[in-house]
């Protein structure tokens, strides 16, 4: 009986994902797609232009940006690709 109860608890934790974390893309500019697991509840994509052309930065959270930098924050997994 104890084994059955323990099995039910483990299955519940796995399926409910009690420690849910966000997955955000974190590749820079035109690099191949990579992701990271984040503790924050949002992802961002920052874009700006400099002497190299258009630069794109992706990551976790929703940072403040300087004037001239575009930012898009979102709240679903890999939404910042």
Curated annotation (Swiss-Prot):
Binds to muscle nicotinic acetylcholine receptor (nAChR) and inhibit acetylcholine from binding to the receptor, thereby impairing neuromuscular transmission. Keywords: Acetylcholine receptor inhibiting toxin, Disulfide bond, Ion channel impairing toxin, Neurotoxin, Postsynaptic neurotoxin, Secreted, Signal, Toxin. It comes from Notechis scutatus scutatus. Residues 1-21 form the signal peptide. Expressed by the venom gland. This is Short neurotoxin 1. It comes from the Eukaryota. Belongs to the three-finger toxin family. Short-chain subfamily. Type I alpha-neurotoxin sub-subfamily. It is found in: Secreted. Disulfide bonds join 24-43, 38-60, 62-73, 74-79. GO terms for molecular function: acetylcholine receptor inhibitor activity; ion channel regulator activity; toxin activity. Transmembrane segments: none annotated. InterPro entries: Snake_3FTx, Snake_toxin-like_sf, Snake_toxin_con_site, Toxin_cobra-type. GO terms for cellular component: extracellular region. Pfam families: Toxin_cobra-type (PF21947).
């Amino acid at each position: 009986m104890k084994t059955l109860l323990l099995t039910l608890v483990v299955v519940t934790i796995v399926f409910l994902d009690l420690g849910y974390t966000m997955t955000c893309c974190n590749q820079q500019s035109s690099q191949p797609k990579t992701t990271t697991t984040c503790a924050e509840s949002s992802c961002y994509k920052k874009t700006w232009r400099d002497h190299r052309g258009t630069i794109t930065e992706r990551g976790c959270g929703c940072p403040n940006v300087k004037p001239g930098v575009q930012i898009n924050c979102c709240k679903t997994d890999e939404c910042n690709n």
